[in-house]
């Protein structure tokens, strides 16, 4: 028969599962940056909300809208055609739905996993999204972390606070700096704070030794397939705040990685790659990793702007290599 055309001529299809595109903030949205990079490389973009992904007789399907993207803060997308496809008709899928990391999120990862079994590259790997909870995954790298206790037992949490004198307490399932408190030994509100954060001893809670360097802010470092982008985004807390989240009003500035930052990345990089975590953001305060964000890391656009990078293009370079491997 006739030789088939080389795969190069076939338009690559990218699925993206995300929050509603009309409500993003374009100039700082990493998912938009990724779609713009994919589009520039000739990919066709298929957009899904979590509600659009479904199992039909065990086949993972999706109701899509195709998108055209624009790097424009007033007009950043247009819908094209609407349709339905098997997820395994796509070449790659970006799972960019923000937490909450709840059962609904987990069900969606099972649907994506079925497409993965049929050869679709999912970024990040669905099983690893389930296994590598943002705050708990740091336990794999104790050499990179400050003293930490995870418990929902108020007595244990209180004992840790007494022992370390100055601590940060946060719910394991929080996002964007919500419900993060600094608690010092002897604080008359300690019991009330433990009760609130642990939802009356029903929710696992993380308490960590306070890292004084937080006054210099925290740093977000991005890794693509385990290799760090050589610049970090330092987030300076709003005056009087303990929280270095952009969502909590922090200001940002880019800076090159320090030697210690690079060491931390070298510790975690191989494990991230082995687990199929192709795009990850780690949060660093002082000398320590405080969180490893695998679900929907951001800060691409800020670093691109500050240093003339194109981080999303690097990501797609990596995705395309993986697909042709």
Residue spans for each PLM region:
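Redox-cofactor binding/interface segments in oxidoreductases and associated redox assembly factors
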Residues: 16, 94-95, 169, 208
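Conserved N-proximal alpha/beta basic substrate-recognition cap immediately N-terminal to
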Residues: 11, 22-150
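Phosphate-binding site of ATP-dependent enzymes
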Residues: 30-31, 154-155, 162-166, 173-264, ...
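Short glycine-rich anion-binding loops that position phosphate/pyrophosphate groups of nucleotides
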Residues: 20, 97-100, 172-174, 297
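ATP-dependent carboxylate activation and anion-phosphoryl transfer catalytic cores
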Residues: 12, 18, 24-27, 239-240, ...
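Short glycine-enriched loops at secondary-structure junctions
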Residues: 126-130, 235-237, 285-288
């Amino acid at each position: 028969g006739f030789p088939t055309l080389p795969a190069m001529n076939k338009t690559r299809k990218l699925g993206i599962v995300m929050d509603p595109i009309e409500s993003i903030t374009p100039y700082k949205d990493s998912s938009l940056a990724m779609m713009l990079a994919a589009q520039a490389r000739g990919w066709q973009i298929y957009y899904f909300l979590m509600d659009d992904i479904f199992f039909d007789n065990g086949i993972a399907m999706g109701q899509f809208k195709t998108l055209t993207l624009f790097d424009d803060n007033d007009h950043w997308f247009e819908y094209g055609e609407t349709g339905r496809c098997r997820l395994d008709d796509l070449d790659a899928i970006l799972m960019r739905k923000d937490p909450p990391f709840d059962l609904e999120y987990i069900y969606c990862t099972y649907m994506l996993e079925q497409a993965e079994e049929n050869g679709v590259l999912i970024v990040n790997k669905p099983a690893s999204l389930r296994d590598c909870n943002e705050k708990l995954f740091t336990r794999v790298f104790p050499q990179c972390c400050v003293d930490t206790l995870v418990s929902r037992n108020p007595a244990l949490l209180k004992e840790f606070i007494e022992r370390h004198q100055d601590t940060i307490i946060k719910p394991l399932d929080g996002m964007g700096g919500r419900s993060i408190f600094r608690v010092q030994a002897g604080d008359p509100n300690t019991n009330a704070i433990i009760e609130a954060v642990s939802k009356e001893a029903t929710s696992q809670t993380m308490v960590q030794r306070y890292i004084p360097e937080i006054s210099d802010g925290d740093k977000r470092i991005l890794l693509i397939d385990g290799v760090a982008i050589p610049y970090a985004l330092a987030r300076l807390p709003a005056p009087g705040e303990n929280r270095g989240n952009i969502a909590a009003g922090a200001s940002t500035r880019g800076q090159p990685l320090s030697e210690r930052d690079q060491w931390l990345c070298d510790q975690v990089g191989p494990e991230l790659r082995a687990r199929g975590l192709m795009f990850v953001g780690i949060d660093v305060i002082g000398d320590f990793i405080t969180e490893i964000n695998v679900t929907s890391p951001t800060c691409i656009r800020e670093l691109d702007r500050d240093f003339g990078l194109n981080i999303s293009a690097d990501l797609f370079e990596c995705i395309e290599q993986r697909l042709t491997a």
